[in-house]
Curated annotation (Swiss-Prot):
SUPFAM superfamilies: Prismane protein-like (SSF56821). This is Hydroxylamine reductase. GO terms for biological process: response to hydrogen peroxide. It comes from the Bacteria. Binds 1 [2Fe-2S] cluster. Binds 1 hybrid [4Fe-2O-2S] cluster. Its main location: cytoplasm. GO terms for molecular function: 2 iron, 2 sulfur cluster binding; hydroxylamine reductase activity; metal ion binding; peroxidase activity. It comes from Shigella boydii serotype 18 (strain CDC 3083-94 / BS512). Coiled coil: none annotated. Catalyzes the reduction of hydroxylamine to form NH(3) and H(2)O.
Length: 550
């Protein structure tokens, strides 16, 4: 096992990365190794997808499957080894079908890629794990050095984050051939184990630029189906009655669940990154979508144990449900998996609803505590002139984009402390689950404009980017000249690709934490600092002073 893709990876003087019987996320060595094997199979599939496009062959089954299967290897998504192997087998079957299509056009069709003809050696998981050792990401570290390995992983993990967003967009009916062609090209190239530093740096920026397009079609999919989010108050306390909790990012799953629970007497609560769903008109119209439950994903083993109903996980993040013994009432969807946990293969939630009706539910309603979400792209753009007016009248001094992932590390209290000392004449724009560090605190307003503005899920960084570009255009300056600072927390690969997206768009002087990614060496961090001004957090007071004076 070697995995260094998330923020909580093991760090030692001898090197970074989880390389024992089990990773910090709870992933076993077996599952981790089989995910490496799956990635190799997907790289071979992408190699043939690139070749097929040369002949004008576009296989939509391949295009929809490849990013979805890659998504299953993202942190805290799928811990189920047999399902990972199933994805690998499907990747190889699709590859062979695509290869046959190519050969039907050109009998001499060939692909020069070491993954292009990969076959699984056995049905036995142990044998497959041994085969996977051939594809462990650091297998040639001694030959290429830590810097090249780090850049490879930056590209691989960034592309993995983009693949997750591609899957979210695809679920909503969004497809862009140019994006998929670019994805396959990059995925196939990474399967050649590239070792050119400049080429890898360029690839990381290409991934960022591609992901901006992905976020654009995801935004179109969400707003096209469910309307543009508008400011909405959400209750974060319990309401009496039967209940289901739904977590993750998949708004379509939430919509289907709301449709199927309507009239059943079962209330639905969002959790984690599903919180922004309350801002969408076509979702909040369901009166039994009664609130949001819990805090950051890392607290789920305590909070899920207390929830008196079933739980549905639609995407990341799931952690071991057996520890607090709620594994009999947690359900997985789509690419999510945990051994022994029931999986929903389709859109039918009737078994979950039946279970909810058989459980006690909340016995009484708690005193409501309302927070506000729903500052989507359209709402933010509508406020652009107000923001400019407040700045011109010196009522608004600075905007802090304070968001990103949450996690268990104690140093993450930095983001709570930072939010609480933001001056009263400054605004906090937040997104993703890092908001749970401070989104239940009171921040007041500036002439009626809330000082805490929740823009949505992690992918809604797109809305923040569009707002920044709009403000810069109206003020006749560059984005980096705005009174705007980005203080981002990271945990997994979606955050990595958001960072690459920002850097590829030329955004500079981003501050990140709580730690630097374990796969980035001091040399690579120095390069990113020199090129983009990217740096790690220090102390709340010092960072605030520096950002306000910039």
């Amino acid at each position: 096992m070697f995995c260094v893709q998330c923020e909580q990876t093991i760090r030692t003087p001898a090197g970074n990365g989880c390389s024992y019987a089990q990773g910090m996320c709870g992933k076993t060595a077996e599952t981790s190794d089989l995910q490496d094997l799956l990635i190799a199979a997907l790289q071979g599939l992408s190699a043939w997808a690139v070749k097929a496009r040369e002949y004008g062959i576009i296989n939509h089954d391949v295009d929809s499957f490849a990013p979805r299967a890659f998504f299953s290897t993202l942190t805290n998504v799928n811990f189920d080894s047999p399902r990972i192997v199933g994805y690998a087998r499907e990747a190889i079957a699709l590859r062979e079908a695509l290869k046959a299509q190519c050969l039907a056009v050109d009998a001499n069709a060939r692909v020069d890629n070491p993954m292009a003809d990969l076959q699984l050696v056995s049905d036995d998981l142990g044998e497959l794990q041994r085969q996977a050792a051939e594809f462990t990401p650091n297998k040639d570290k001694a030959a290429i050095g830590e810097n090249i390995l780090g850049l490879r992983l930056l590209c691989l993990y960034g592309l993995k984050g983009a693949a997750a967003y591609m899957e979210h967009a695809h679920v909503l009916g969004q497809y862009d051939n140019d994006i998929y062609a670019q994805y396959h090209k990059i995925m196939a190239w990474l399967g050649t184990w590239p070792a050119d530093m400049n080429a890898l740096l360029e690839c990381s920026m290409e991934i960022g630029q591609m992901n901006f397009k992905v976020m654009s079609i995801l935004d179109a999919g969400e707003t096209g189906k469910y309307g543009h989010p508008t400011p909405t108050q959400v209750n974060v306390k319990a309401t009496a009655g039967k209940c289901i909790l739904i977590s993750g990012h998949d708004l379509k799953d939430l919509y289907n669940l709301l449709e199927q629970t309507e009239g059943t007497g079962v209330n639905v609560y969002t959790h984690g990154e599903m919180l922004p769903a309350h801002g969408y008109p076509e979702l909040r119209k369901f009166k039994h979508l009664v609130g949001n439950y819990g805090s950051g994903w890392q607290n789920q083993q305590v909070e899920f144990a207390r929830f008196p109903g079933p739980i549905v996980m639609t995407s990341n993040c799931i952690i071991d449900p057996t520890v607090s013994a709620y594994d009999d009432r947690i359900w997985t969807r789509s690419i999510v998996g945990w051994p022994g946990v029931r999986h929903l293969d389709g859109d039918d939630f009737s078994a979950v609803i039946t279970q909810a009706q058989q459980m006690a539910g909340f016995p009484y309603s708690e005193i409501p505590h309302l927070i506000t979400v729903g500052f989507g792209r359209q709402t933010l753009l509508g406020a652009a002139d107000t923001l400019i007016d407040l700045v011109s009248r010196e009522k608004l001094r600075h905007i802090f984009l304070l968001g990103g992932c949450d996690g268990a590390r104690g140093e993450r209290h930095y983001f709570t402390d930072f939010a609480t000392i933001v001056p009263d004449d400054c605004l906090i724009l937040t997104l993703a689950c890092g908001k749970y560090r401070f989104n239940k605190l009171e921040f007041g307003d500036i002439e009626g404009l809330p000082r805490l503005v929740d823009a949505g899920q992690c992918n809604d960084a797109y809305s923040a980017i569009i707002l920044a570009v709009t403000l810069a255009e109206k003020l006749g300056c560059g984005v980096n000249d705005l009174p705007l600072s980005l203080v981002l927390s990271w945990f997994e690969q979606k955050a990595i690709v958001i960072l690459l997206t920002l850097l590829s768009l030329g955004v500079k002087n981003i501050v990140t934490g709580p730690t630097a990614p374990g796969f980035l060496t001091p040399d690579l961090l120095a390069v990113l600092n020199e090129k983009f001004g990217l740096r790690s957090i220090t102390t709340v007071e010092e960072d605030m002073k520096q950002l306000l004076s910039a």
